[in-house]
C-alpha cells in the first residue's frame, strides 16, 4: 500500500 499510505512512506 505505498506510497499513498503514510505508515509506508
Swiss-Prot record:
GO MF annotation terms: ion channel regulator activity; toxin activity
Ubl conjugation in keyword set: no
UniProt modified residues of type Asparagine amide: 9
Listed PROSITE patterns: CONTRYPHAN (PS60027)
Keywords: Amidation, Disulfide bond, Ion channel impairing toxin, Neurotoxin, Secreted, Toxin
Tissue: Expressed by the venom duct.
Localization, UniProt: Secreted
Keyword field contains Secreted: yes
Family statement drawn from the similarity comment of this UniProt entry: Belongs to the O2 superfamily. Contryphan family.
Protein name: Contryphan-In1172
Species of provenance: Conus inscriptus
Lineage: Eukaryota, Metazoa, Spiralia, Lophotrochozoa, Mollusca
Amino acid at each position: 500500500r505505498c506510497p499513498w499510505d503514510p505508515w509506508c512512506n
